[in-house]
Amino acid sequence: MEKAVNDGSHSEELFCHLKTISEKEDLPRCTSESHLSCLKQDILNEKTELEATLKEAELVTHSVELLLPLFKDTIEKINFENANLSALNLKISEQKEILIKELDTFKSVKLALEHLLRKRDYKQTGDNLSSMLLENLTDNESENTNLKKKVFEKEAHIQELSCLFQSEKANTLKANRFSQSVKVVHERLQIQIHKREAENDKLKEYVKSLETKIAKWNLQSRMNKNEAIVMKEASRQKTVALKKASKVYKQRLDHFTGAIEKLTSQIRDQEAKLSETISASNAWKSHYEKIVIEKTELEVQIETMKKQIINLLEDLKKMEDHGKNSCEEILRKVHSIEYENETLNLENTKLKLRFPCRITESKNMNILIVLDMLCYISSEKTTLAALKDEVVSVENELSELQEVEKKQKTLIEMYKTQVQKLQEAAEIVKSRCENLLHKNNQITKTKNKNVEKMRGQMESHLKELERVCDSLTAAERRLHECQESLQCCKGKCADQEHTIRELQGQVDGNHNLLTKLSLEEENCLIQLKCENLQQKLEQMDAENKELEKKLANQEECLKHSNLKFKEKSAEYTALARQLEAALEEGRQKVAEEIEKMSSRESALQIKILDLETELRKKNEEQNQLVCKMNSDPETP
């Protein structure tokens, strides 16, 4: 930046010096032939000065041409960079300032050249070689008109310059009247030569500084190109990674859909197994209920039989006790009768001894009594025999009842074993149901985990897509900035074209001067340089068009990428909706299965409660019947 400021100050000094020279040279000049040789020498010196100024202008144009690819590189760098926009803006602003200063210097050099051309016109008009100069002027004017026509087609500023040129011609005619002597002009020209040599030295230093700056800018352009290549590779890698991620995501979706189908098929199989197990459990439960009912009936019968046996045993005991008591009473009576007989016998013997007739009567009476007693004893013996027969029959019935009890016990044991088997089968069924429920819970948990994983993956993919959106928006912003910078570059190119056209005008003026001085070779070189400049301008226009095409292609690529991004986002949203719908369907199925299981369990519990109530009722009825049976034998 400091070098650019110094260069601008040098150019301003040169411009002021040229103005002072022009003011001094406007003095009247003499038209003597003796000073023509001096004038020729001055013209040659001015020719060398013009060549030096032309070289300086070429250097300035070369520096401008070198700056333009730097701007292009910076534009390309901006297209592919993701960060350091502030640094790039600073670089661009610095380069803009440098270009503006160089353009100012270029304009000042142009004005100095125009001033020198005017001065030469003044000198040449002061010569007596008017005929030759007029011919040359006519030729030059014809050429100038042709060139001006071309320039008028391109821009309208050259018309103003032509008007200024005509006004300056009028001023030269006026200035010729007031020209001074050639000696004073020669001295002043020598002073100017010395000053211009010093200025040339300064300009050489300035050119060296520009060369160093150009080298730095070339290094920066290379670095920027390398960074752009790195950014391109990174963007390509990102695109490849996004493509791979999309492929992996599609594969995961396919795998997830297959897993969902497998899970649904497994759930259906488990539902079929559950229905089979439930039907089997219902059959086992019905069989178990029948066995329980039969068991309860058998238990009731056993209890009734036991009660009947107990009652019969009690009756037998009562009968035995009654028979024992009756036998004891009979024995007592027999003993009492025997004792009475003995006593009677003793009394009879005594009475026989006393009263023999009465003894016979008493004997008859005793015999009758004994006969009565014997009849009573025989009747009681018959009753005892009948009781013994009843006891035997009761014992037979007891043995039969015991056999029946044994059979019933064996049946009860069989039923108990069957009940145990049924209980074991029911426990197995319960364990299976619990296992199935546990498996269903595990499946639901795994489903939920898979769903959470898929949600996390979807969220990560959505975050990546948001990042891609941010990168696309950043790229669009950069495109907008690049377009703005392109417009600025176009404006600068237009300014440079204007300056180059002005230089062409100056070159045309120099060509006129050189034709006046018969310097055709230099004119050819200048024409070649002008053609080169025109070619360079055309190249610049072509490069600008290429840049515009690149920008258009980039915009199309961005639009295409935006469309792809929208399509992918729509696909991802559709897939997410499908996943959510599948998850909701799975949850609904699981909830329906749970509701079915709960309804079945509630129905089973209700059936069990109903069976328990029925068993209680039957037990109560059996108890009532037993009570009635017990009350019936007690009533007689």
Curated annotation (Swiss-Prot):
Signal peptide: none annotated. The keyword Coiled coil applies. Residues 36-97, 141-220, 249-325, 377-484, 519-631 form a coiled coil. Keywords: Cell projection, Cilium biogenesis/degradation, Coiled coil, Cytoplasm, Cytoskeleton. InterPro entries: Odf2-rel. It is found in: Cytoplasm, Cytoskeleton, Microtubule organizing center, Centrosome; Cytoplasm, Cytoskeleton, Microtubule organizing center, Centrosome, Centriole; Cytoplasm, Cytoskeleton, Microtubule organizing center, Centrosome, Centriolar satellite; Cytoplasm, Cytoskeleton, Cilium basal body. The keyword Glycosyltransferase does not apply. GO terms for cellular component: centriolar satellite; centriole; centrosome; ciliary basal body; cytoplasm. One of its GO terms (biological process) is cell projection organization. Mainly expressed in trachea and testis. Not detected in bone marrow, bladder, leukocytes. Only weakly detected in tongue, stomach, brain and ovaries. Acts as a suppressor of ciliogenesis, specifically, the initiation of ciliogenesis. Belongs to the ODF2 family. This is Protein BCAP. The gene is ODF2L.
